[in-house]
Amino acid sequence: MDDKHQQRNLVIVTILSALILFGWSFVTKHWLSTPPAPTQQGKNQPKAELTAEESGDKPLKPVDQVLQETPRLPILTESVEGSVNLKGLRLDDLTLIRHRETLAKNSPAVRLFSPAGTENAWFTSFGWTGENVALPNADSLWKADSDKLTADHPVNFYWNNQQGQIFRITLSVDHDYMFNATESVINRGNSPVIVQPYVLTNHQGVFKTASSWTLHTGPIGVFNGSVNYHVDFADIDKATNNSIRNNTQGGWIGFSDKYWLTALAPHNQKIAIDTDFRSSSNHHYQADFTVAPVVVAAGKTASTSVDVFAGAKEVRVLDRYRDQLHLPHFDKAIDWGWFAIIEKVFFYYLDWLFLHVGNYGLAIILMVFTIRALIFPIANKQYASMASMRRLQPKMQAVRERYKNDEARMRQELVTLYQKEKVNPFAGCLPMFIQFPIFIALYKTLLVTIESRHQPFILWIKDLSAPDPLTPFNLFGLLHFTPPHFLMIGVLPIILGITMWLQFRASPQQLEPAQQQIMSFLPLISVIFMAPLAAGLQVYYIFNNLISLAQMMWLQHRHSTPEERQDRAERKRPSKKKA
């Protein structure tokens, strides 16, 4: 293999990486995904039947209006703010103050939870099922022993059934996104009662970001030590009784959007729980779990502690909860995919660079320099092998001519020649294969991590996780029309195509005219392929191409013979026209 393949290798890397990325994701999703845990049937389920307002029988109302209809207790930390609904004791008002909806300066914070009766309603609540005992429900009014929930001040909520039992929920929240609820039943009656604690999260409709081969959104959980990505909202609708139940020891269950997550877990990961995904006819989806029934003797108190994550899927935060709270595979609430180890290495290095330089685009460029420096010894050997192959061309051609009627003998003699001259004809392929995991890892890192969301680079690039927004087909926004999808080719993909064309032109032109014509179209194909991908990925490949071009020119000079250098110099001289 010689330098004429350099440009083709880069295009092959891009195309094959895409095939691996989308094809392997399809295979793992449909054939290699974790099998569902056995479906369990039981009598006791969380009592979260929807009222007429919640079930969609009434017109939806603005969030601000609904928030004023019930008594509330404020929530305020450095990461979240909102309120607890004292009617039914629900977490149904929560915004993530570290994240904004859009890039606009006046953009509101991302709203995660909204009360029932509003658009995109999403809430979490706690409760009990039981026998021979009056239980709190969605209309019960709870009392609090404080006027605000903060990271430093938990709040106790009480409800008295006036029959001898007091229900208490102690709610706390940390400085990020983890709530803890201790559900207690204080039995002051004369006889024992049986209760079964539960926690649920309820979401109206499906997420805007649909689940795909490359990114799972929707129902998610860890059951008996295995992450389950295989359930979609549609699967719940099609299930028997619109319910998918699992019995598991520990684990967690919830709903995951691209960047946001609500997850429910027993604080004690050694206990058994019954989990359930279910839906109503009007597309309310619920994830919940119950623990084993508890007999509360007269004069005794029984308590169960549950954890509720409600927030952004920040990588370091999820990793910390996985380790500190022993939540199994909690970091995999981010759908890293099959190449998770490589992707997390990329993420942590990118994040480290970003913390030092303050610009995510610059961090990507520095990562390019790092990777090119690491593989430079391989590239050096590659070009040395290519130079040896070029010098060997006359002998190879002689072997082909001598044994042109005997393919087997010709291959044998060529192998003998390679061994004698100590040349590896496949040495030029290694850098190409190294770029496979790099492409896939960076693609997934920019796709699934919230840390790259809304990260600017320079000039018009305001979000490196999104495609380049400018296109020459509407004069970069001066013309008030949106080009069709196939014409949404931004400036960065065009620059990327130019750098690929420069690489092609800088390579020794030893191709046949027909081959050269075909190769000249490959940069255009890559432009079209890369256009809908994240701008950060395009920035990576632009600078990767430029550095690769500089390395290629230097290595060509270093490993070329005097005759080859003279030939290149003559080709650069302008030809003189005859008089």
Swiss-Prot record:
Keywords carried by this UniProt record = Cell inner membrane, Cell membrane, Chaperone, Membrane, Protein transport, Transmembrane, Transmembrane helix, Transport
Keyword presence, Disulfide bond? no
Mention any one GO cellular component term assigned to this protein in its UniProt record. plasma membrane
Membrane topology of this protein: Multi-pass membrane protein
Q: One GO BP annotation here?
A: protein insertion into membrane
Sequence intervals crossing the membrane: 10-30, 330-350, 351-371, 423-443, 478-498, 523-543
Principal localisation: membrane
State where composition is biased (Basic and acidic residues). Answer: 560-572
Q: Does the keyword Protein transport apply?
A: yes
Which InterPro entries does the annotation name?
Answer: Membr_insert_YidC, Membr_insert_YidC_N, YidC/ALB3/OXA1/COX18, YidC/Oxa/ALB_C, YidC_ALB_C, YidC_periplasmic_sf
GO MF term set: membrane insertase activity
Task: Locate the region Disordered.
Answer: 35-61, 560-579
Per UniProt, what is one Pfam family of this protein? YidC_periplas
Q: Where in the cell is it found?
A: Cell inner membrane
Question: Which PANTHER family does the UniProt entry name for this protein?
Answer: CYTOCHROME C OXIDASE ASSEMBLY PROTEIN COX18, MITOCHONDRIAL, OXA1
Q: How does it assemble?
A: Interacts with the Sec translocase complex via SecD. Specifically interacts with transmembrane segments of nascent integral membrane proteins during membrane integration.
Give the function comment from the record: Required for the insertion and/or proper folding and/or complex formation of integral membrane proteins into the membrane. Involved in integration of membrane proteins that insert both dependently and independently of the Sec translocase complex, as well as at least some lipoproteins. Aids folding of multispanning membrane proteins.
Family statement drawn from the similarity comment of this UniProt entry:
Belongs to the OXA1/ALB3/YidC family. Type 1 subfamily.
Give the protein's recorded name: Membrane protein insertase YidC
This chain's source organism reads: Zymomonas mobilis subsp. mobilis (strain ATCC 31821 / ZM4 / CP4)
Q: Which gene encodes it?
A: yidC
